[in-house]
């Protein structure tokens, strides 16, 4: 099976935990890492600097569309910052664990 990482930013820890618990609980993801970040970006012609959370979500490639759709339903941002990256290589037992942890 192929595997992917999904990267997403959220407004705060509460939103991150809600997304992580939903994805893992629904077996769409094996794991979600949450960490604090500072983002600088352009929004409506202004430069904005904000404290946010970033998430790295581990899943099977075939589930990425479902993961993205689920995140969109839980996110508060107008323009969701959601991307996926294919895992080219990884520890075989870890990748097997992703398979076993998702449906």
Residue spans for each PLM region:
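Positively charged, small/polar-rich N-terminal and surface patches that mediate targeting and assembly
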Residues: 1-103
């Amino acid at each position: 099976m192929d595997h992917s990482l999904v990267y997403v930013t959220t407004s705060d820890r509460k939103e991150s935990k809600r997304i992580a618990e939903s994805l893992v609980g629904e077996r769409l993801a094996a794991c979600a890492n949450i960490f604090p970040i500072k983002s600088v970006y352009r929004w409506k012609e202004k430069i904005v600097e904000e404290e946010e959370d970033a998430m790295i979500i581990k899943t099977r490639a075939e589930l990425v569309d479902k993961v993205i759709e689920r995140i969109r339903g839980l996110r508060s941002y107008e323009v969701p910052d959601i991307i996926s990256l294919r895992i080219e290589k990884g520890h075989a037992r870890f990748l097997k664990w992703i398979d076993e942890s998702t449906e």
